Amino acid sequence: MNFWFGLIIGLKEIGAHKFRSFLTMLGIILGVASLLSMFALTEGVARGMREMLAASGGVQRVEVNNKEPSEEKQDLAFLSPGRTMDDVAALEKGASLVDLVVPEMNQGMPISRDNKTLRLKAIGTSPGYFELGILELEEGRLLAQNDIDQVNRVVVIGSDIPGELWPENPSYRPIGESIRIMGVPYRIVGILKHYESNAAKRKREAGVSDAQLKRRMARMGKTKKKMRQYDQFWEKNHCIAVPYSTYFNDFRTASNADGSPNRKLDRLSFRVADIALFDETLTQVRSILDRTHRGIDDFGFDTREEWFDNIESSIRATRTSGSLIAGISLLVGGIGITNIMLASITERIREIGVRRAIGARRHDIFVQIVVESGVIGVIGGILGLLAATGVVQVLVLLSPVENAPIITFSAVMISFGFAVGIGVISGLYPAWKASTLDPIEALRYG
Amino acid sequence: MALVELRDIRKIYHVGDQDIAALDGVSLTIDAGEFLCIIGPSGSGKSTLMHLLGCLDTPTSGSLLIDGVDVSNATDDQLSRMRNSKIGFVFQAFNLLPKLDVLHNVELPMVYAGVSAKVRRERAIAAIERVDLGHRMYNTPLQLSGGQCQRVAIARAIVNNPKIVFADEPTGNLDSKTGETILTLFRELAESGCTIVIVTHDNNIASRLPRRIEMRDGRIRVGVEAAKSQTAPLLVSHPTPQKGEEAQP
């Protein structure tokens, strides 16, 4: 039988029992809607996390962090100097698989100009800091090796700093001006570019001004401070970077309890030159640091790769459990279709007998019933997609900007495919039953 | 030539642990262009015979040739093909599909024959006009009278140009006047060369047809057929060939 003819019959059948068909479809509609919304939600979270990962330097960036030494070495732990500039020197000299080593000393400090004071994290670092963190300059210059060598009191600031220290003139680019870090004057030599997430950019382009945002935040009972955790670029835009040599001289020379200088780094990061040699690089770095730490394993690696894997696996887990729930909903919908199709063929036994008598083969009857239930699946799927779009719109309004759900084409196709598949599969048993009816019996029926 | 040939057909139904012979050795020949009826009381096997002739069922034993094709051991699909291309059915209860209009009801057999939509439309219209229902093309069966419904059913039966049309009590649900017009329609079809078999228990109809086959207890009654076919008034204008071999020896 002609497929299109079957389709027309199916549509007519659905049209003849609109309410019944709608109730039948409801299971599919809800199933598809929940499946697609779930896909959109996890996709949104995944995007947000990937964006954050890329913003922090990607998988090539590895951080050396502090770790409890293993048990047998705990008594000797005092031998290790910890992470110091010696590590940096050793890595720069010996780690051939590493192409960038960045030390960092940092501490929250008052940053002031005239009578305005911000409390921000000041960072003492090397020029590589900007390269590793993918920070670009807007105006002036970045830190240079020269600044380190000559212990210059210069600072590179994030794009939000001028606006906050010169509120009377937010567009002022204060290159050459002086700010005080814990009372010590530093000269501003560079201002970084303004960073914002794609979501924030979209929002800005859609015309949500800061004022609107503030009002919105006020309405939601949130202060700006609370909103910080949602902006992964906040730190970049509030950067206060000075040469580590100057930082050490100004803030660390007598900072230990006994008055000795604190030589420890707060952060030590490096960049893997070739991602294909990731594990080899870690081994190399480990053996070099073993020497500088005098054999005490008081350090570990925080790789973005692990972080990335964690993100991916948690997203997968969410997706799996969400799919399971949506799948159960779809299954229930499918059972509903089977049920209605069984009722429908019982209603139409005579019609089936007539079709058989005028020459329909078993196969034709089978196809007709499967097409009918498939059509229910298709229509239910389309309605479900529309419903999901609505649900996602609501979620976009409710959820934090970075994790706003995103409907992807493949998610749409998968959800829709499931709906159609369930529709067709649910029709198989009724179709088989209808096609094996004895035409003589069927003609006599009713 | 013989359009339908039955040789010693048996049809046995198993009911519980009993075997019931609905047909018990029936032999019969129907020639192309014949207009005949199968008559008998209920339980005589006439419906079973029609189902076999109409390829709705296969015999337990014996051979059954329709248009030269042996269908006694045919598969379900082969039987469906036969019904579609060589056989037309008219039922007592019309059995039109209530959701489809007249045109689509008549088109239906051609859908299963795989005829293109355009040709389907043309042939359906021609068939509907042949039964005088050109003005009811887009009505559904529920909007038609019983006689009109039966005419639609006849149009549907003939639209694929079948070799043979079976009518099972075609006037059973109609008043006598309407029944008369349906019979007239069949007669016209027979005159144009179509082979028509009417299954009935109504002697009034049977006595006016050129040939009658009387069933009793799963067999064809010997002698009755020959006698009737000679005495019956010939309603069909052209002479119908009679072979008279149908009765059991």
Q: Where are each of the predicted segments found?
A:
Chain B
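H-loop (His-switch) and adjacent beta-strand-loop-beta switch element
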Residues: 212-225
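ABC-family P-loop ATPase nucleotide-binding domain
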Residues: 1-12, 222-249
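ABC family nucleotide-binding domain
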Residues: 2-215
